[in-house]
Amino acid sequence: MQKIRRDDEIIVIAGKDKGKRGKVLKVLADNRLVVGGLNLVKRHTKPNPMSGVQGGIVEKEAPLHASNVAIFNGETNKADRVGFKVEDGKKIRVFKSTQKAVDA
């Protein structure tokens, strides 16, 4: 079970976007996350009339390493760590500071 999943709200704790918050769009296999509106890079694309792609400079989200982000706890308005707890035979994610469920 992953500590950070898609649609989690995270806060960046290291790097050029430190302190910014965003929502996880995609979790990649190599422990990296794509976060909406953060870690933007410019990519130069060639026009491709066959697929309808217009050329130019496109800004898109690049992946961040999971160690540079922390899950955002809306109750405390701070970055938090994630732990696991077994309730009713199911393993759930909980915030370390409040011991409340992340997905609640």
Swiss-Prot record:
Q: Which UniProt keywords apply?
A: Ribonucleoprotein, Ribosomal protein, RNA-binding, rRNA-binding
Gene Ontology MF terms:
rRNA binding; structural constituent of ribosome
Annotated Gene Ontology cellular components are: ribonucleoprotein complex; ribosome
Question: What biological process terms from GO does the record include?
Answer: translation
Q: Which PANTHER family match?
A: MITOCHONDRIAL RIBOSOMAL PROTEIN L24
Q: Which family does it belong to?
A: Belongs to the universal ribosomal protein uL24 family.
Q: What is this protein's function?
A: One of two assembly initiator proteins, it binds directly to the 5'-end of the 23S rRNA, where it nucleates assembly of the 50S subunit. One of the proteins that surrounds the polypeptide exit tunnel on the outside of the subunit.
On assembly, the entry states: Part of the 50S ribosomal subunit.
**Protein name as it appears in the record:** Large ribosomal subunit protein uL24
Q: Which organism is it from?
A: Pseudomonas fluorescens (strain Pf0-1)
Whichever gene encodes this chain, its name is rplX
